[in-house]
């Protein structure tokens, strides 16, 4: 019984650590998003409303819209899109961003999908 109690107690600690790491990773990803110029097209909140967005055809993706992810909306798919870019769009390839940073960017972008859903109340 003491062993079971210890196992259950330690599991809770690991979950808290995982939540903190995910939040920290997302915050780092957001900083990378700004620093690498993603916000110029996608906007600071990833809504596709950056300063140059209106001049781009097709317009930049609104990361809240799950249907707009053409190559998948998971971390690996987003990371690969960052690396390779999107053909026939203004989205360039970013192969110079190291894989660990691309992953952090992808975690941030993925987090935008669940923060808000598109509805009639948002503009």
For each feature predicted by the language model, list its residue ranges.
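Extracytoplasmic electron-transfer domains, predominantly the class I c-type cytochrome c fold
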Residues: 56-110
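Sec-dependent signal peptide recognition
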Residues: 1-2
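C-terminal motif of bacterial Sec signal peptides marking the signal peptidase cleavage site
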Residues: 7-10
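Sequence/structural segment immediately N-terminal to covalent heme-attachment motifs in c-type
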Residues: 23-47, 53
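Surface-exposed patches in mature extracellular/periplasmic domains of secreted proteins
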Residues: 92-95, 116-121
């Amino acid at each position: 019984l003491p062993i079971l109690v210890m196992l259950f107690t330690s599991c809770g600690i690991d979950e808290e650590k995982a939540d903190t790491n995910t939040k920290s990773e997302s915050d780092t990803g957001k900083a990378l998003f700004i620093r690498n110029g993603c916000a110029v097209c996608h906007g600071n909140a990833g809504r596709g409303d950056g300063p140059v967005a209106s001049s781009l055809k097709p317009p930049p993706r609104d990361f809240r819209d799950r249907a707009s992810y053409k190559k998948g909306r998971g971390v690996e798919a987003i990371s690969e899109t960052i690396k390779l870019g999107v053909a026939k769009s203004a989205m360039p390839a970013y192969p110079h961003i190291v894989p660990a940073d691309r992953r952090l960017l992808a975690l941030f972008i993925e987090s935008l999908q669940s923060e808000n859903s598109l509805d009639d109340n948002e503009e």
